[in-house]
């Protein structure tokens, strides 16, 4: 659990902002949303597999688009 020490004379809003940032870094809210409802093991595997496929397709798309960038043009034929 993230903790934040409030300094003497510090604005409570700044302390709250630091606490929210530390919670975000720790991933508490995402974990809470994930555990809000029970997910069957098969559904969890299916979701993870779909996420892996999506990451893979995104990586392939990035690789293909970077190859089409400047400097990778076809040479003109001089015939």
UniProtKB/Swiss-Prot annotation:
GO biological process: translation
Transmembrane segments: none
Region ranges (Disordered): 47-79
Protein name from the UniProt record: Small ribosomal subunit protein bS21
Superkingdom of the organism of origin: Bacteria
Signal peptide stretch: none
PROSITE patterns: RIBOSOMAL_S21
Gene3D superfamilies: Ribosomal protein S8 (1.20.5.1150)
InterPro entries: Ribosomal_bS21, Ribosomal_bS21_CS, Ribosomal_bS21_sf
Coiled-coil portions: none
Keywords: Ribonucleoprotein, Ribosomal protein
């Amino acid at each position: 659990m993230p903790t934040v020490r409030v300094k003497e004379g510090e604005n409570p809003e700044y302390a709250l902002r630091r606490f929210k940032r530390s919670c975000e870094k720790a991933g508490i809210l995402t974990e809470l949303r994930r555990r809000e409802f029970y997910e069957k093991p098969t559904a969890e595997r299916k979701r993870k597999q779909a996420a892996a496929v999506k990451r893979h397709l995104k990586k392939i798309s990035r690789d293909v688009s970077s190859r089409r960038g400047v400097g990778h043009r076809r040479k003109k034929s001089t015939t």
